[in-house]
Amino acid sequence: MSNIKFTTAAEAVKCIKSGDHIHLSSVASAPQCLIKAMCERGRNGELKDVHIHHLHTEGPAPYADPEFEGIFQLDSFFVGGNVRKVTQSGFADYIPIFLSETQKLYRSGAVPCNVAMIQVSRPDKHGYVSLGTSVDATLAAVECADNVIAVVNKYVPRSFGDAMIHS
């Protein structure tokens, strides 16, 4: 990652453009403050045709609400309780794939990634942050994205190996 800027969630999501493909980090690492700010932009008519990609996320998934039809399109690799009803109703799409193959979607270009919205641990003294519990497709999304928006969260656990990225 280069060109590091510290800013608010509302400012950070201004890099999202209509037609972009967004990756959200998974499970408890879903960046809720960024999701909320992105949805506010959608609600204000600033965005349309934005594709949201993620594995299973915990917490609210407001971008999957039918009020955002034409603004956000959810293309989920796994379907959790927070998006099950909208997926069953046809408002969101499910892309069946093995977890081990999710990184290939981004690296091959089969699924574009304009913006990766993630949570990371605090940086260590060498400037490395950890993806914590969300290495899965998030690592490939970070590597392939045009822009990475990271929420630094002191509660994200530091995991090593491929989870470490330089801030």
Describe the residue ranges of each PLM region.
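Conserved alpha/beta enzyme-core scaffold
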Residues: 1-167
